[in-house]
Amino acid sequence: MTDQVFGKVSKVVCVGAGYVGGPTCAMIAHKCPHITVTVVDMNTAKIAEWNSDKLPIYEPGLDEIVFAARGRNLFFSSDIPKAIAEADLIFISVNTPTKMYGRGKGMAPDLKYVESVSRTIAQYAGGPKIVVEKSTVPVKAAESIGCILREAQKNNENLKFQVLSNPEFLAEGTAMKDLANPDRVLIGGESSPEGLQAVAELVRIYENWVPRNRIITTNTWSSELSKLVANAFLAQRISSINSISAVCEATGAEISEVAHAVGYDTRIGSKFLQASVGFGGSCFQKDVLSLVYLCESLNLPQVADYWQGVININNWQRRRFADKIIAELFNTVTDKKIAIFGFAFKKNTGDTRESSAIHVIKHLMEEHAKLSVYDPKVQKSQMLNDLASVTSAQDVERLITVESDPYAAARGAHAIVVLTEWDEFVELNYSQIHNDMQHPAAIFDGRLILDQKALREIGFRTFAIGTSPDQAYNLFGTAGY
């Protein structure tokens, strides 16, 4: 019988205090009061925010859980060596951005932070540790982590490591609900006795609130690939319905009606069939590109091309929407004030990573439009930094104004462009807004949340993704613009 290498987990550490690490560990602390959970990060300012009354990320329900558990069995610290030394189980939850240089530029994930954390664990471990990939990583990343940790074992017989894959399946804006009631928890590990022990310990943590039949165990590689494939399938759904939105605009069909009819087929289902200006966020594009790169590396060009098409449609949809705005505003937006409603990549989050708003705004800035931006959760500094990263700081200063309320953003504007589906945008007094705008006033609904008929009755010209144009000012006259 194999000796028990790993004892019962009583101390959990997460390296990385971002959108995944913070909420995940808050939920573990909430559901497992007998386990001490510590979130560590090199960014001392971020840790200070986690220890303050204003948390560094906005997520419905997060504040209540953090404030209840913090100081009891949930802690935030920048003392990484101490936390690693004391931990039984360590989550790696650091950023894995797309590489912007060298081999794999623009496609492959950059694993430098994962490697750095792995070396830090090897340096300060001191005893047996279960190491868990929480970051989205390419297939075989656990093998790289394990290689680093095994080298450390050669010099210290007290060190024993097992590397598991436990990808997150959170949707920002509903992360706490997703954590409290997940569709599934996926854990990948080795089939060795030690690997099975490590998997069992992580299963035991989740069993405190997740039914055992929702906890799936696989080999490590299947777990890593499943995460990429899940996000690729979701992104594919969005690109699929967005491609059909262009057909609807050209034919007089309504995308909402088409999606509703198609979604009634139980083999297809209705989720992720909401046409829009395009998907954003930290995961979808990054993970699809990672899958494309993997397929190219495996000499599977047809598969790589198939998934690259998902990204191509998303980029085309953003460009198409921006071109539509320009065309409908008499083919010029130069020096025209345009109000932008929404900057986050989706509602109920302040996250702006890969937001479609950034891309649409960039295209309009290239035409020298003057843009007045409002978002209820995104900080002004975040907006300006994001835009300066895709254009120039001078153009941002010259063309961008950030407002603290939507009425101010729309005052004197030629058009309103809805780029995030915030609930508050549905409830605004559009009669008042219309009175304060340039006429003819237009609304471009990139999220299909507004009542187009009611807006037309007020006097707006309306244009929505996947619907026939209202008044035919379009100089191009086709869905492709």
Curated annotation (Swiss-Prot):
Write out the pathway annotation from the protein's UniProt entry: Nucleotide-sugar biosynthesis; UDP-alpha-D-glucuronate biosynthesis; UDP-alpha-D-glucuronate from UDP-alpha-D-glucose: step 1/1
State the name under which the record lists this protein.
UDP-glucose 6-dehydrogenase
Provide the gene name from the record: sqv-4
Chain residues that bind NAD(+):
16-21, 41, 46, 94-98, 135-136, 172, 283-286, 353
InterPro entries, alphabetically?
A: 6-PGluconate_DH-like_C_sf, NAD(P)-bd_dom_sf, UDP-Glc/GDP-Man, UDP-Glc/GDP-Man_DH_C, UDP-Glc/GDP-Man_DH_C_sf, UDP-Glc/GDP-Man_DH_dimer, UDP-Glc/GDP-Man_DH_N, UDPglc_DH_euk
E.C. no:
1.1.1.22
* A GO CC term attached to the entry: cytoplasm
List the SUPFAM superfamilies.
6-phosphogluconate dehydrogenase C-terminal domain-like, NAD(P)-binding Rossmann-fold domains, UDP-glucose/GDP-mannose dehydrogenase C-terminal domain
What this protein is reported to do is described as: Involved in the biosynthesis of glycosaminoglycans; hyaluronan, chondroitin sulfate, and heparan sulfate.
Question: Which organism is the protein's source?
Answer: Caenorhabditis elegans
What does the record note as the disruption phenotype of the gene behind this chain? RNAi-mediated knockdown causes a reduction in the size of cortical granules during the first meiotic division.
Bilayer-crossing regions: none
